[in-house]
Every structure is written in C-alpha cells, then in structure tokens.
From Swiss-Prot:
Pfam families: DD_K. This is Dermaseptin-SP1. Probable antimicrobial peptide which stimulates insulin-release in glucose-responsive BRIN-BD 11 cells. The keyword Secreted applies. Transmembrane segments: none annotated. Keywords: Amphibian defense peptide, Antimicrobial, Immunity, Innate immunity, Secreted. Its main location: secreted. GO terms for biological process: innate immune response. Expressed by the skin glands. It comes from Agalychnis spurrelli (Gliding leaf frog). Disulfide bonds: none annotated. It comes from the Eukaryota. GO terms for cellular component: extracellular region. Belongs to the frog skin active peptide (FSAP) family. Dermaseptin subfamily.
Amino acid sequence: AVWKDFLKNIGKAAGKAVLNSVTDMVNE
C-alpha cells in the first residue's frame, strides 16, 4: 500500500533525525 511506504519513509527519516541528535549530544 502507498501509505505503508509513506509511513515507512517517515519512520526512517525520524529515526535518522533522532540518531543524529543523540550523536550530536554525545559528541559535545
């Protein structure tokens, strides 16, 4: 289904954003 792919892409993007935020906090 199209909406499933849509949600999957949002999930991936959100996951990357969270991961980047955590990495930035750890590096500082």
